[in-house]
From Swiss-Prot:
It catalyses: S-ubiquitinyl-[E2 ubiquitin-conjugating enzyme]-L-cysteine + [acceptor protein]-L-lysine = [E2 ubiquitin-conjugating enzyme]-L-cysteine + N(6)-ubiquitinyl-[acceptor protein]-L-lysine. GO terms for biological process: chromatin organization; protein ubiquitination. It is an enzyme of class 2 (transferase). It comes from Debaryomyces hansenii (strain ATCC 36239 / CBS 767 / BCRC 21394 / JCM 1990 / NBRC 0083 / IGC 2968) (Yeast). This is E3 ubiquitin-protein ligase BRE1.
């Protein structure tokens, strides 16, 4: 339906474009009563002012939105750069997950939001990678010999910094909220000032104000013209009216004189009665001042107030003294408790420190012993490896020796089998001798080689047996060393578990220390508050004593003043006669003024009676003009449909203004057309205004 209406509007605008170009602008009338065109002009200008205020709000919102967008874009660029840096760091270090390494989850902050999207998944991945890199580095960089005093000092410094930062944060948040509220107030004031400026510069409002002021002027001018016309008519019609006016004037003067006489008599009677009262009161006061008693002083209001104030001050001083004594006792008790707690904590910390140092020394000694045993075992292992290699070479030599012996035996058997006596007999004696010598030399060489090989084999066998014995001994020592190693590892595990327990105890003790530090700070704050209150009480006591002394001095001054007043009384009696004379002069002046007032009142009554006469003759035309102007103003401000409610909703399609109730009723009844021009509108075309 709204889409069809928009189409109709576009069609109508396109058809009537040429007519709108030649259509003259609306003009506000400058004088005379307000017309219907002036009312329409007034409505349009009100809508224009409201649209300008909406535009200003929109510009402010767009400016804020642009600032937020620029901040968002800069933050997104920074996040992308930081992500690339972290990715390059992770790639440089290389992420390799190890099963033995425990991730320290307290290093990096976890994500707080529950729904995990793409960005949250990426951040979780980066966090896991950084934890795998940082946790082993932090574990390796932890020192075993940590000084507790340094740790406690650092904790105290950090706690102090945290407290200061919290206080600064609270103050800054309060300042921020105050500045935000001030900025909102200033924006609202600026908008109201802009609206007021628009209303001041609007022609229609100036025209209405002029019409309202001109209405009163018109009434006065009309009354004056009526008077002049009446006078003219009376002079033309009847010349005897002058005599009537003179008669009325004389009668009014006589009445004025009578009223003046009556006022003079009343004022004289009042003056006489007042004079008698004043004389009596003066005599009574003089008698009282001459004969002042203690009862009069006690019954005096100032004396009672001073006495009550003195009592209150004494009671407050006593109460403050009691409170001071109780606070001093509490302070002493708190100081004693604080010293006892400090001594206990120092004792416990020293004992725990000594036990930890002893356990650490034991573990270091055991570690040195285990390392020496390990080094010995490694050296023996290298020796055994070398001996094992020598044994393999000996086995190979023995195999070679066996092969050579077998070869010699085979050659000898062949020699015996192939040796023919016929050949030997064929040889000569010299050849036989040479051959025998050669054989003897060969036999000697063979025997020598055999002996050498035999000695080598025997020495090798001896060394092998020695090595086997050594291996057996070393295996026994190795088993012993393994047992010692396993025992030391068990001891190491127990020490590591004890170390963890001690670490947890140290953490608990540190938490207790931090809690005790907080308690100490709170106690110190309380002590400071109590000392301040004690000082305040002392100051109050001193001030009370000073006030008491001042009151005593004031009482003495009152006694002195009493004597001086008695002296002044005689002087006052002398002055009384002067005052009586002044009183008579004042009474005369007052009587004269009363006479003047009576005359003026009588003139006012006479003028009012004349005005009533003139108003009864010619006031119908003025009243009709006033009614017309009032109806015009009502038509501007009241709804033309129901004529009950004020106009507060404008239809932006045609510019007509009605009340919100009538527009909503028409929308609910699906009568979506303007009652005056019959143009279609929707709920989006309504605009709330303030006339």
């Amino acid at each position: 339906m709204d889409h069809d209406n928009d189409k109709k509007r576009l069609h109508e605008d396109s058809d009537n474009s040429e007519i709108k170009k030649h259509k003259p602008l609306d003009v506000l009338s400058e004088d005379g009563p307000l017309t219907q065109k002036d009312v329409v002009y007034f409505k349009k200008e009100a809508i224009w002012r409201q649209m300008r205020s909406y535009k200003q709000k929109c510009t402010l919102l767009t400016r804020d939105l642009n600032d937020i967008k620029s901040n968002y874009e800069s933050n997104e660029r920074k996040i992308n750069v930081l992500d690339s840096w972290y990715e390059s760091i992770i790639n440089l270090f290389g992420v390799k997950k190890e099963s033995n390494v425990e991730l320290n989850e307290t290093i990096l902050i976890q994500l707080t939001n529950v729904p995990i999207g793409d960005l949250d998944a990426l951040l979780e991945k980066r966090r896991a990678q950084l934890l795998t890199i940082l946790s082993p580095i932090i574990e390796n960089s932890k020192l075993s010999n940590i000084d507790k005093s340094d740790v406690l000092e650092k904790i105290e410094v950090l706690n102090a910094e945290v407290a200061t930062l919290k206080s600064e944060n609270n103050t800054l948040s309060k300042l921020k909220s105050q500045f935000e509220s001030k900025v909102e107030d200033l924006q609202a004031q600026l908008l109201t000032l802009v609206k007021d400026n628009d209303r001041r510069s609007s022609k229609t409002l100036q025209r209405i104000d002029e019409s309202l002021t001109n209405g009163s002027d018109v009434k006065e001018e009309a009354s004056e013209t009526v008077k002049s016309e009446v006078n003219k008519d009376t002079t033309v019609k009847n010349e005897n009216s002058v005599d009537n006016e003179e008669f009325e004037r004389i009668s009014s003067e006589i009445e004025e004189l009578k009223s003046d006489n009556r006022l003079l008599k009343e004022s004289m009677n009042q003056i006489n009665t007042n004079y008698d009262k004043v004389v009596k009161e003066n005599l009574q006061l003089s008698d009282k001042l001459e004969n002042l008693n203690e009862n009069d002083l006690i019954n005096s209001v100032s004396y009672q107030e001073l006495a009550a104030h003195n009592k209150q001050l004494n009671e407050s001083v006593n109460n403050l003294q009691k409170i001071n004594d109780t606070t001093v006792n509490k302070l002493n008790e708190l100081e004693n408790k604080q010293t006892n707690v400090k001594h206990l904590l120092d004792k416990e910390l020293r004992e725990e420190n000594e036990t930890l140092k002893q356990q650490l020394q034991k573990s270091e000694n055991d570690l040195v012993r285990i390392r020496t045993a390990r080094d010995e075992l490694l050296s023996k292992q290298t020796i055994l490896k070398a001996d094992f290699e020598n044994q393999t070479t000996n086995d190979e030599l023995n195999k070679l020796n066996k092969v050579l012996n077998e070869r010699i035996n085979a050659l000898e058997s062949e020699r015996h089998e192939t040796g023919d006596n016929s050949k030997i007999s064929e040889l000569s004696k010299d050849e036989l001798i040479q051959r025998i010598n050669m054989l003897n030399s060969e036999i000697k060489e063979i025997e020598q080689a055999f002996q050498e090989t035999r000695e080598n084999s025997l020495s090798k066998l001896m060394s092998v047996t020695d090595q086997e014995n050594m291996v057996k001994k070393l295996t026994i020592e190795k088993t012993k060393a393994d047992q010692k190693y396993f025992a030391s590892m068990r001891l190491k595990d127990s020490l590591s578990s004890e170390n963890k327990i001690l670490k947890t105890q140290i953490n608990k003790s540190q938490e207790l220390v931090s809690k005790l530090n907080d308690l100490e700070k709170s106690y110190l704050d309380k002590i400071e508050i109590l000392t301040k209150s004690n000082n305040d009480f002392k100051i109050i006591r001193q001030s009370a004593l000073q006030e008491n002394s001042k009151l005593q001095e004031s009482l003495r001054a009152i006694d002195v003043r009493k004597a001086s007043l008695e002296k002044e009384l005689s002087g006052m009696k002398d002055k009384y006669s002067d005052k009586v004379q002044e009183n008579t002069s004042f009474t005369q002046e007052l009587n004269e003024k009363n006479l003047m007032m009576g005359k003026l009142e009588h003139k006012l009554k006479s003028t009012e009676s004349l005005l009533k006469k003139y108003k009864t003759n010619n006031t119908s035309s003025i009243l009709q003009e006033d009614e017309r102007q009032l109806e015009a103003l009502r038509s501007i401000a009241k709804c033309s449909v129901c004529s009950k409610n004020w106009k507060d909703t404008a239809i932006t399609v045609c510019g007509h203004v009605f009340c919100s109730g009538c527009t909503q009723e028409r929308l609910a009844a699906r009568l979506r057309r303007c009652p005056t021009c019959n143009k279609g509108f929707s709920a989006n075309d309504l605009l709330s205004i303030h006339l």
